């Protein structure tokens, strides 16, 4: 078994391959430890990296889009490989995927479940019905977009959207989490 040399990535830059440039960076870190006794770093980026790699979505399947959401968790697309594990409880999850038609009677329940989720929390709106009412937009009993009830971070278009589209939405959410600069939203 071989031992691999770590690749250093300076903040905001490209990875530095093993060699003299990496030795310079390691030398600077070693000098800083000798002079000050500690190294200053950004904890936010580490925490956001960990959060992005371990999303726990709560399924809020309301209509036919929920089938595509379930399909995305099965063997072909396997969201588990991205650290995404579906949770049945809002207290255990940090992402809510709203999939399907949101009615006026269901809107208070959606808000209640959202409020039960711990901070920081994110919402993915999946499908035309969740995004803006979809086919039932002009019905008296349909909310014209779940963003009127909860703040939405990622919109996944389609009727119903494919599993690939939801997978792309999850990857976009991971990028968004890594970009944020605060520990709390």
Curated annotation (Swiss-Prot):
Pfam family, one: Oxidored_q6
Recorded catalytic activity of this chain's protein: a quinone + NADH + 5 H(+)(in) = a quinol + NAD(+) + 4 H(+)(out)
UniProtKB keywords: 4Fe-4S, Cell inner membrane, Cell membrane, Iron, Iron-sulfur, Membrane, Metal-binding, NAD, Quinone, Translocase, Transport, Ubiquinone
Domain of life: Bacteria
GO biological processes: aerobic respiration; electron transport coupled proton transport
Keyword hit for Chloroplast: no
Bilayer topology annotation: Peripheral membrane protein
Cofactor note: Binds 1 [4Fe-4S] cluster.
Cofactors demanded by this protein: [4Fe-4S] cluster
GO annotation, cellular component aspect: plasma membrane; respiratory chain complex I
Localization: Cell inner membrane
Binding-site positions, [4Fe-4S] cluster: 64-65, 129, 159
UniProt cross-references to InterPro entries, sorted A to Z: NADH_UbQ_OxRdtase-like_20kDa, NADH_UQ_OxRdtase_20Kd_su
Gene Ontology MF terms: 4 iron, 4 sulfur cluster binding; iron ion binding; NADH dehydrogenase (ubiquinone) activity; NADH:ubiquinone reductase (non-electrogenic) activity; quinone binding
Keyword Calcium attributed: no
EC code(s) of this entry: 7.1.1.-
HAMAP family (UniProt xref): NDH1_NuoB
Protein's job: NDH-1 shuttles electrons from NADH, via FMN and iron-sulfur (Fe-S) centers, to quinones in the respiratory chain. Couples the redox reaction to proton translocation (for every two electrons transferred, four hydrogen ions are translocated across the cytoplasmic membrane), and thus conserves the redox energy in a proton gradient.
Assembly notes: NDH-1 is composed of 14 different subunits. Subunits NuoB, C, D, E, F, and G constitute the peripheral sector of the complex.
Similarity remark: Belongs to the complex I 20 kDa subunit family.
UniProt protein name: NADH-quinone oxidoreductase subunit B
Protein species of origin: Rhodospirillum rubrum (strain ATCC 11170 / ATH 1.1.1 / DSM 467 / LMG 4362 / NCIMB 8255 / S1)
Gene name in the database record: nuoB
């Amino acid at each position: 078994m071989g031992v691999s040399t770590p690749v250093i990535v300076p903040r905001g830059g490209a990875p530095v391959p093993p060699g003299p440039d990496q030795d310079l960076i390691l030398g600077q870190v070693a000098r800083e430890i000798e002079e000050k006794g500690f190294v200053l770093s950004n904890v936010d980026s580490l925490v956001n990296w960990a959060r992005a790699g371990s999303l726990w979505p709560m399924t809020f399947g309301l209509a036919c889009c929920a089938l595509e959401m379930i399909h995305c968790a099965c063997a072909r697309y396997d969201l588990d490989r991205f650290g995404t594990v579906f949770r049945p409880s809002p207290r255990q999850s940090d992402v809510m995927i709203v999939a399907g038609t949101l009615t006026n009677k269901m809107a208070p329940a959606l808000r209640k479940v959202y409020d039960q989720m711990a901070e920081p929390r994110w919402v993915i709106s999946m499908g035309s019905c969740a995004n803006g009412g979809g086919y039932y937009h002009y019905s008296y009993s349909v909310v014209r977009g779940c963003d009127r009830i909860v703040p939405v971070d990622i919109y996944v278009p389609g009727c119903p959207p494919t599993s690939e589209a939801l997978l792309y939405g999850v990857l976009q959410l991971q990028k968004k989490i890594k970009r944020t600069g605060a520990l709390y939203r």
